[in-house]
């Protein structure tokens, strides 16, 4: 799992040089319904990793999903802005604030929080005493999820996630060490990619060598 900073300055498919987080919404403005595919194309074009499918959930949908299973116990491994080390039970509103908050930190910390939350949610759902909540989880998720994953593939993906478990996933973040902050000619403060360093991460994670 690789988290990419939203201000990374890349060549956005069909648009040109822009922040990577514009790949979705600028395409949606131009032609509704094309945003997800354009985001996939942009990732493939810049990182050299084939994107088979996408899963999109709006931040607000996270609240619905978390509340549907009665909250999530989030394990915070080290002190963060506003949070001490340990397990904190979060409802939907608290979980949304946790993954979105950048106060006292920045986008790099936000990405780390996102991975911490996903791992905590995953571990919780794998506990036998939580299996009774899976129907509510799946139902709430399907209501707020947008994806091109075919339905027939759902069981296979589910078994793969169950077999692998969150501890079997290598999670990385494109950090300050892989970017160079700069200001564009238009005055935007963005992050220039150090492709040599990023390509090394991509090769280690996905086993591909970007061209």
Region spans (language model):
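Non-catalytic, solvent-exposed segments at the cell envelope interface
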Residues: 1-211
């Amino acid at each position: 799992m690789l988290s990419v900073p939203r201000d990374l300055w890349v060549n956005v498919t069909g648009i040109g040089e822009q922040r990577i987080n514009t790949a979705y919404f600028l395409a949606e403005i131009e032609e509704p319904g094309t945003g997800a595919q354009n985001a996939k194309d942009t990732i493939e074009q810049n990182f050299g990793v084939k994107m088979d499918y996408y899963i999109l959930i709006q931040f607000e949908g996270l609240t619905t999903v978390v509340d549907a299973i009665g909250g999530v116990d989030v394990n915070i491994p080290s002190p963060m802005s506003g949070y001490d080390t340990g397990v904190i039970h979060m409802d939907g509103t608290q979980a949304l604030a946790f993954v979105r908050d950048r106060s006292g930190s920045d986008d790099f910390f936000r990405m780390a929080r996102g991975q911490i939350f996903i791992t905590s949610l995953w571990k919780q759902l794998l506990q036998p005493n939580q299996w009774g909540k899976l129907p509510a989880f799946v139902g709430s998720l399907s209501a707020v999820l947008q994806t091109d994953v075919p339905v027939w593939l759902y069981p296979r993906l589910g078994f793969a996630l169950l077999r692998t478990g969150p501890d079997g996933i290598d999670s990385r973040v494109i950090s300050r060490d892989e970017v160079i902050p700069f200001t564009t000619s238009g005055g935007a403060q963005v992050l220039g990619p150090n492709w040599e360093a990023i390509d090394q991460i991509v090769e280690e994670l996905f086993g591909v060598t970007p061209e």
